[in-house]
Amino acid sequence: MFFFGTPNKQVSYLPGALSLAICTALGVSPVYAEEPLYRSLIVFGDSLSDNGNAGIFTSDDPLGIYPRQPAPSFLADRLGLAKENSCYGLGPRFGGAIPCAPAPGGLDQQLQQISNSVLTNGPNWGVGGNRTADVLLDVVGPQRFRQLFPDTTVADHNTLTTILPDSSRCGEDGICDPLAGESPYLSPAEVLAATAAFNDPMALQALVDDPNNNITLTGVPFATGQGYLPQNTPVSSDLYFLNAGGNNILDGVRNGTLSLMSMERAATFLSTAGSELKAAGAKYVVMTNAPAIGNTPAVYSQGAAAINYANSGTEMFNDRLRRQVNDVGNILLLDLEGVLELVLDNPAAFGFADINQSDTCYVNCANPHPVYGANGTDPNADMLVFYDAIHPTLAGQRLLGDYYYETLTAAVGFGLLPDLGYQNSRQHRVNIDHHLISQRYRDPFTTVFFGASLGHAELGAGPALNDDYPAWDGFFGMSFAGFENLEWGVGMSYGRSVYEPRNLRLKSRNFNYSAFARWDNDFWFVDGAVGFSDIKYRDINRTIYLGDTFRHRFNASTKGDGYSASLRAGYDASRNLDSHMGPFVSAEWNRIDVNGFNEKTSINLTYAGAYGERRDPLGLWVRGQDRDFRRCKAGFFYNSPKSAEHQWFGEFWLEHTAGDDYADLGIGVNSIFNNWARLPSYRSKNTGFFQNGVGAMVGVSVNDKFRVAADLLVRPEDTVGGLSINYRF
């Protein structure tokens, strides 16, 4: 519950003037710096998300390092995105008597304050006390909300919705006409009447039902009184974060009204908010489930019956939300409940005091801690999970923010798995090229040969960190003399590549199989190959950090396949010489498929579900992915005369690349059954493997059996290359 002082009578709520300021400010869009992963983070939620609209419900940092803020704001910091609240510049923090209201002062001062707030347009719409209905309301605005749910009552809403700006006070169209004296704000008398009834639901409902005042249930935390979608068009790179449900469960606990029907209704509001965002064009939508309310100090002190009752509400709400969100599709659920359960089960592992954290808090609960509490012998909120009876301390908020960040960015690293398989295929291709180029315009020959290549690889592109590491391939082949001027062969190889920037290790091992052939008629030549790769990713290791203390490495493995085809043709432009040289063109195609997998974790990092099953809230399950790579080359070749003691061979070319240089990857949390969403993963346009470049391969025969070659590829962002050998028995 939230309490407000009596509004200062000097505050002027002049309808026409305020409407004029708002209308003047509308149409100006905020500008956020482009980020490689997400453009902006837009937050809707309750006190676990509120960054100042109704307050900030957590502790101060004892060391003064971190600002007082909720977990989504820590997430915004790590993503490098804006985090201001949607009513930034208004409300009690800036002198206003109530949330989203201007400070007392002259008319011009209030107009300027409101205009500045609208222009700032902070992306955090969280409001302490919000229920799930209020999250939907803030997303779609009053008009659309009433179309979707015309029958909500005070019981469905945060009491603050009665006094926040509401564009429906300006008429059905939601557009305030200053000439008609319309305003989204209440008069001072109406504010007084509404706030006086905050602790009396029946009295507040009577005010809402009274047609003779402007008190409504559809106020939103924005000075125009309009919701997010009526004023904004989602951009494909925006990330939408929704969190609510805890207050709905608490209401049911207090009133003894928890039921499957009530929790399903509460979940429906939240899933509908996700559905409305998706329908409007939002691409990345994530939600948290609700924490186990019975394990908070607000309920825990009441005994086992209250704990079990409250936690049954959490179980029902989270299950209904999961089912509904899965029906909408492509919305990721984060296991807030599970992470907090891990912390409460073993607080010392996460940097908190090794005590029963559910039974105590820093301040304002039944049992503030006698040592670390605000009035304890050694006050230190960082040693406690709970700030008050419900909300986490700043240390807890930061831990949750780290969890959100680690989960929402994991797809970036996993998106490099196809590239590792492709890098191995390229090394296999180097060995085939070494054989085909060195034998160009030579008589077909039946033999067995061995090859090996070692290459310098630059893996990582777009949001993925660049990491250089050698890749190698050992090749065994057989060639056969066919009919006149034709040689064909088969080969197999084993190759390996590794990608290991900080906190991530990916290793690919390829078993490659190819069939190849070459033909010439002393003028034209054609060669090509087709191949298949059996790829094993036995080392997929991701390390996460939560807070200052907790560190854990996840292990996983999976398999994949690779397919390839290539064709090259050219002609000898120096037929009067013993050597051969001329132009050529070539085309290569590779496809890499990677199967899905689940990260594995320790049993100590799981919690018990409703039926005793172990649930892993930190590990992820990753869906399969595939990627096409295409290369086209045009250049010149050279082969020295057959009579030369050391036969030189080589190619020089310009190459153009294409393929799947942009991809998202399906990610889900292990503990959330059958829920997943596609998150930003691979962004390699004009970078990484998808750069055009200039390349060359030059080799020489040391003797009749042994050849050595070097290859080099110069691209705008890097230079890669390597060495290869070929021995014919």
What would you call each of these model-derived segments?
Residues 588-594:
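Solvent-exposed flexible segments
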